[in-house]
């Protein structure tokens, strides 16, 4: 038996986070999970209903009824990792290999003169661009990024169509396409259409992961799996990468700083274990929100997230000071 408590929080975006969402406050809960062996650990639960998740209240309601969503299963798995590290008085960053992160550009208006040179000077190699608001302006932005020599990751969040994607890619300047590392979820998963899309760019699978009939495919019509430990079974995703000779990138779920540190910890562990199979991560998403007491404890050095104070995922004093509500299972 485990005992689960939760503490609600609100994150306030600095601006709209992607083409699927408005810049409205986002609700989530931190979870405190306690086991019979006396260990306890912390994790985040931050659903994105806009991208197909059950709502926060639906997931908590399921949990009260004794049912666990995939997200809650992952939260408990992460909390157990945290608990074991707290027992050993170790930090989640202590055992892995340092890993770079891409810079997330959520809006083309962020691209000010000198901005890209500043990123390069800080040590960034790669910019991830949220696509789909205004493809013409975004194409112009990609041209500017390509001129800087930085690699690009394009994320369409499966909101487009094959026809729109093909037209967009074919019309890009010749200087741009060679610097596109991959395109994430170009449109809703379709085995044959994604296979055609691969002729235009390397394709990464992210929020369409559950749409793939893994037991039925004879080949993988994509090159990279992007996993979010907050909602993806990490071991299963790694096994698929090994089976189909794919690369893997770890990203946070644009969630609470607790979730950010968990994601980086997983990325560092995988990089240490699997080497070149693991690409740069995309976990520096805490800066998309207004500063709070948790985000204030996070520091970066260019594309690296630095170790914060505490054991496990850290934040010891802040977590201790929160009000926790026990979740009663019916």
Curated annotation (Swiss-Prot):
It catalyses: (1R,6R)-6-hydroxy-2-succinyl-cyclohexa-2,4-diene-1-carboxylate = 2-succinylbenzoate + H2O. The gene is menC. Its EC number is 4.2.1.113. Belongs to the mandelate racemase/muconate lactonizing enzyme family. MenC type 1 subfamily. Monomer. Transmembrane segments: none annotated. Keywords: Lyase, Magnesium, Menaquinone biosynthesis, Metal-binding. It comes from the Bacteria. The keyword Electron transport does not apply. InterPro entries: Enolase-like_C_sf, Enolase-like_N, OSBS_N. Pathway: Quinol/quinone metabolism; 1,4-dihydroxy-2-naphthoate biosynthesis; 1,4-dihydroxy-2-naphthoate from chorismate: step 4/7; Cofactor biosynthesis; phylloquinone biosynthesis. The keyword Nucleotidyltransferase does not apply. SUPFAM superfamilies: Enolase C-terminal domain-like. Mg(2+) binds at residues 155, 184, 206. One of its GO terms (molecular function) is lyase activity. This is o-succinylbenzoate synthase. Its cofactor is a divalent metal cation. Converts 2-succinyl-6-hydroxy-2,4-cyclohexadiene-1-carboxylate (SHCHC) to 2-succinylbenzoate (OSB). Does not show N-succinylamino acid racemase (NSAR) activity with N-succinyl-L-phenylglycine as substrate. One of its GO terms (biological process) is phylloquinone biosynthetic process. The active site is at 130 (proton donor), 228 (proton acceptor).
């Amino acid at each position: 038996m485990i005992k689960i408590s939760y503490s609600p929080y609100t994150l306030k975006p600095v601006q709209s986070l992607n083409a699927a969402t408005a810049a409205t406050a986002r609700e989530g809960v931190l979870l405190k999970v306690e086991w019979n062996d006396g260990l306890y650990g912390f994790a985040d639960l931050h659903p994105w209903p806009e991208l197909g998740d059950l709502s926060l209240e639906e997931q908590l309601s399921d949990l009260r009824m004794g049912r666990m969503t995939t997200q809650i299963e992952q939260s408990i798995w992460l909390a157990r990792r945290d608990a074991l590290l707290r027992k050993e008085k170790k930090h989640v960053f202590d055992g892995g290999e340092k890993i770079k992160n891409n810079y997330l550009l959520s809006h083309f208006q962020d691209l000010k003169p000198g901005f890209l040179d500043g990123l390069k000077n800080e040590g960034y190699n790669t910019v991830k661009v949220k696509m789909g608001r205004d493809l013409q302006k975004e194409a112009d932005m990609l041209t500017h990024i390509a001129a800087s020599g930085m690699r690009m990751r394009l994320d369409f969040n499966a909101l487009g169509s094959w026809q729109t994607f093909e037209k967009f890619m074919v019309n890009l300047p010749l200087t741009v396409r060679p610097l596109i590392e991959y395109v994430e979820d170009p449109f809703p998963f379709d085995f044959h259409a994604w296979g055609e899309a691969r002729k235009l760019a390397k394709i990464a699978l992210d929020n369409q992961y559950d749409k793939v009939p893994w037991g039925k495919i004879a080949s993988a019509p994509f090159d990279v799996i992007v996993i979010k430990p907050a909602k993806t079974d990490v071991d299963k995703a790694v096994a698929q990468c090994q089976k189909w000779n794919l690369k893997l990138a770890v990203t946070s779920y644009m969630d609470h700083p607790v979730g950010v540190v968990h994601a980086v910890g997983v990325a560092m562990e995988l990089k240490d274990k699997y080497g070149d199979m693991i690409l740069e991560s995309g976990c520096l998403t805490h800066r998309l929100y207004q500063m709070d007491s948790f985000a204030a404890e996070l520091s970066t050095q260019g594309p690296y997230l630095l170790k914060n104070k505490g054991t496990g995922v850290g934040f010891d004093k802040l977590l201790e000071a929160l009000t926790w509500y026990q979740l009663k299972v019916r």
